[in-house]
Structures are given as structure tokens and as C-alpha cells.
């Protein structure tokens, strides 16, 4: 019983060690990594690979009511069916030849720049969309009719009504645009000139005069790149509604030593109509603050992620306080990394109610403004809630003057918990896009993030509380390749109604489901280990979780992913209906090497090998060394000996749960026996060898001998020696053939000459037989 107790203690120690390593380590590693081929074979991705004369599928508009996804691209606007994007309609909207020639004469690229790249695509009313494009460096806008009802099947361009797109769409297709259409008015952050230097936040359309940010003042905007725009209520009074712009820009002089990029959030009041004597047709309520996304470091030196790439607003029960998710990357070309930070709107409002940034001159540092702040406070919307002013045109002159010279806040906005919820620095990609879905699970609600990258992959990540719901950690569930070739993901939309994710890039559009519960496995433990809020064990399979289902049939543990607690009573079911044990038989040659391949589906699983000798029940752990080398794909056994024959068991250990994946039976053949088998047919000994030799063709014999020598011959030290032997044998055989070939050739030549006289009149071509 002593050896049995030792094995039991060893087994339990391995489980505890694996569980500790799992808890301390691999949540930042995708548990499942699915290639594009695997996604296609499992019917988990549908791709639209674009048109030959189009590209840049970057502008998305999701319409859940009509079940359509509108996509703006180069010279085209598409209407995709949300159920299957293979079903689509298209509108062709190119520029005229005159515009294209003018663009070419201006020195622009005729293929990459001199076209109509759609940059704005918004719902205008119940029957029309509003679209704007670059128009070959001549921005243009128009309306698109989509009908009253989905069954109308209308998708038509209003080509009789075109508008100037200046201040709505950029001239340059490489520039980003953020836009929002509310109550017939278009808010847009874009460049308003051909050279791409006059950046501004505009409000156009509607019945009011167009309005914009102050021009040529770096304190307001300093070479910005706009990301997104959102309407967020400030109170229950609609007059207090504000539009928030997210962008990145160059740091203001004196704000940072050297050149740097800062992420910003800017605000404007929806009912801002400009000043009366100063800031006429300019925003009077514009304020901006820096968004911080950094990792605290030693000695107070933080690692900053300043390049804002994308923003997603997760609505809550209180429409005034959505959660802001931001995707950031580093500015450095040496250190490349990505991060996701969360912000609360209460923190944003607290910063906008804080001190203004102020400095007395160009050579002074920025400090908090200590003087008297005029009333009403600059940045406050004119309404009955916060003051007695009905319009920004009624604001006192000192308020307008102060607002013009103090557009920036001194304090930055820090993320929730003062640090990112996810960081990636050790990979060959960077984050580009994000959408978030709030999912009801057995033990609460979880936010599932879908993050796009610049190599065409999508990461599925869930935020899980460690000890409290305020202390979150990210668990990377899946990494999916959604395009055939690596490409930057530039647009993403999530349909909660269809439970589908839609992805845009330069190459095309992809569609994939939010959940793939069946790929996790056919056992309760495998479903539980996945920690996917969308999935639960229903008693017979890993399937979609629905909160209304009967509680007793659901097994799910997102917070801990502990199968030992939730699936222990179903272990018998798992063994019979779950993962089936794969068995293999491998033959190896004494003194040669062989490889035992075993790769678990989960990248977080710890692989554990056991060895069982012939005719023995006892199993022992395999120790690595010079004789046995462990790799990520399996075990490499060098210099095989007869004692290595036996059963090799490959186990996967994850979160304390052990699963046997593979049983390999290794048979080691001694060298003398192999040489006897290889050369018996040449010597003519042995009746069995003769029978096998008679049933094999000469080419099969040579191939078998070459193959066995290549993989198992103990006397061949290098591949060169083997190739040299094969080359010598082939050369010897070729030397023996010329006599026979020459005879056949002469015979055919004689036949040709005998036929020449008969064929001279017709000059027909005589084709040689295949054997020559």
C-alpha cells in the first residue's frame, strides 16, 4: 500500500499545483484560439469578401428594427441582412470623372484617395438615412430612402438632392470622423479644409445657423483625431442634454515635455447657439479634459496608454450614467501595448465641475485657475435647472470671455479603480475596436467585451470580480480569426436581438455569433471551465443560458470556473457521454527518437504525463531530462530503449480538474529485428517476407525502406547521409536504364522514318507514345 499512498499524494499535489498556477497565471491567455479555417468549418463565421471595385468597409449603422446593417465603403453603400450578410443590397455612388481628374491633378492617389469614401451614415428620420462621403476631396452629402417598413424593401439614393459636405465629412479619406444626428441636426468632428489642418466640431443641418469650435486656437483643438460622439442626458430636463466627443490630440504647449498625444473627452450643450458679441456662431459651452489610462509603476512613473482608438458606451438603468469603455494603445514605437479602461460619467462630471487649466503666458506652466469664476459657470447649459438664462446668446460677456480662454480642465479623468481592466503588451497585435454586451448569468450580470485587433482577430473577454464587484479582472475566453488574411478591424457593431457580431475592415465584412457553446465540449466540467456567461450545462449538453430556465438543470460558474464543485455529481455522465479517450499505437526503433503528440483544446490547461509499463497496473509520473523532452505539442523521447515500451497517458489539468485526453501504446523494436525485416527481401530468406514481397510493387518496397531508414535508422546521423544514399541508388538505377531506353527510342525512330513518306502530303503531326 506504500506505493499507492505515494501515488495518491503525488496526484493530489499535482492538482493543487495546477490549481494555484491557474489562479495566479493564465487568465490573460485565450482559453480557446480558433483559426479562420476552424471558424469556417464550424459555421461560426460568415464573410463578405468585398467587391473588386470597392474597399474600406469602415462606416457602420445598425438598424435593429429593420434587421439591417448599413455599411459605407468606397463608392458604395450596402444594406446587409442581419440574419445573414450574404443577403445584401447595394447603392453605387461614385464621383464624376471631372472630380476624379481634378483630384488626380492635385497630386492625390487616384485609387486610394480620388474616390467617394463614405464617412457619415446616420438615421435621419423614419424613412431616410443621411450619408456623406469624401467625394474625391470634394465632400458631398445626400439622403437615402429606406421606406417606412422593413417589408418595403426600399434602398434608393436621392440623386436629385446633393449637399455640400464641408464640415460634415473630411476631404481626406485617411482622416477619422465622429458624427451624431439628433433632431435633424448633425454634430460632427472633422477636418474642414483640403489640407486637413482646420479641425473643428460642427453642428450643421437643421434650422439654425451652423456653429463650430474656435478656429486656429490650439487651446481648443490641437490637431485632433475624432473617435466618436454620444448624447448623454445631464438631468431629467432635456435642455441640459450634452453631446460628448471622444478624440485624441497633440498635447498643448507646456502640458507635456516634448511631443505627446493625449486622449480627450469634450462636451458641448445641445442648446448652445453661440455668443451674442463674442464667440458668434462658436460654441460657448465647449470644455475638454484628459482621459488617463495608465498602469502605476515603481517610483511614481506610470506607463501611459494615450492613443485612444475606440469608445463604447454601456447603458445602465440610469441613462445619465452609462459606463464608458475605451480602447487605448501606446504612443511609443519601441514599447507597443494596448489597454481597456472603464470610466464613470460621475467622474467625468466631477472633473468638468473642477478647476480650469490656466497659465499666464507661453513660458509658464499650466496651473489650476485660482481666480473668480464668472456666473453662470462656463460649460453650464442655459436652462431653468442651473440658472435663469434661456439662451447662450444671453450669457454675460465675462462668461463668454472666460470660456474662450479656458476651454481645458486642469484635472484629468481617471479610470474606475485607477487602472486598466485589461492590458496586452506581449503580443504582435494592438487593439482597434470594442463593443460590450451585458449578459445575465446564474450569479449576476457580466460585461462581455469583444475587442478587435489590427491583425483581423477578435478577443472575447469577460470581466469577473475577484473579491468584490468593484475589483474586476479580465478572463480571456476566446481569440478568433475572422478574416482570411490579416487586416485591421476598423468597425464593429453588436446586435443583441440577433445575438450576432458584425465586423468591418478594408477587405470586407464578417459576421459571427456571440456564443459558440458547443465548441467547449460535451461534458459538464468542460462547460463549467469555459466560464462563458452565455453558456451553461443544461443536463445533457453545453448550450445557451437563459435566465428563465429551471434552476435545477443549469450548471454554471463564471466567477470561479470550478467544475469540482458544480459537476462532481455528474462525473459518471461525463465519463460515458463526454470526452472519449483517444488511443494510439506507435512503433519506434531502438536508439532512435519518437514524438508523442498531445495538445489540449484549452490553452490554459496544464499537461501531465504518466507512464504504465507492460502488464503492470502501477502508473508513474514522467520526469523530463536528456532522455525525455517536453514541448507544447507533446513529448519527445530520444534514444529509445526496450524499457520505454508501454502505455503513455496524457492528462489535461485545469482549475483542479483532471481529464485524460490520450493513451499512447509505444512498441520499441530492437535494431537487429528491424534490419532483419528490412533486408530479408533482398537476401531471399523467410517465407513471410517472400509473401509480403510478392504483394508489394518495387516502388512500394523502396518507399517503405526509405521511410523507415529516415525516421528510425540508428546509424544515420544526418539527413545528408540518408539523401546521399538515396541519390547514389537512383543514379545507379538510371545508369542501367539507357540500353533499354535507347532500344525503344531506336525502334520508334525507325517507325517514324518509315511513315515520313506517307505523311509528307498531309504534314500531320505524329505524337509519340507516353512510354517514350
From Swiss-Prot:
It is found in: Secreted. Transmembrane segments: none annotated. Its main location: secreted. GO terms for biological process: axon extension; axon extension involved in axon guidance; axon guidance; axonal fasciculation; axonogenesis involved in innervation; basal dendrite arborization; branchiomotor neuron axon guidance; dendrite morphogenesis. Keywords: Developmental protein, Differentiation, Disulfide bond, Glycoprotein, Immunoglobulin domain, Neurogenesis, Secreted, Signal. Residues 577-665 form the Ig-like C2-type domain. The keyword Ribosomal protein does not apply. Residues 677-698, 729-772 are annotated as: Disordered. Belongs to the semaphorin family. Strong binding to neuropilin is mediated by the carboxy third of the protein. Interacts with PLXND1. This is Semaphorin-3A. It comes from Rattus norvegicus. The lineage of its organism: Eukaryota, Metazoa, Chordata, Craniata, Vertebrata. The gene is Sema3a.
